């Protein structure tokens, strides 16, 4: 409904809009139930610009050989990948810092491996 009225909303990834609504809902729930302060935009002195998008049908991919990240509504983006990972990608948060650079933080689900119990104690002074 809003996308018909505001055409520019079609340019934005739908999960970015959905996550924004979830964040706003959580802020109002805390305000009414946990007696937190009234939710307000913190953009007066905060230059933190970011959004989070979720994965669906493989719309977020990382190519370690070509150093590229595929994000929804964007082409393949050239990236400096600092470490490799294995597991299923859950979401990606894209941030712009005040210098104008962009950073992508990728949330990955991996299997939890428990360490074996050794029955030895270690003391640290």
Question: Where would I find each of the regions flagged by the language model?
Answer:
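Nucleic-acid substrate recognition interfaces
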Residues: 1-124
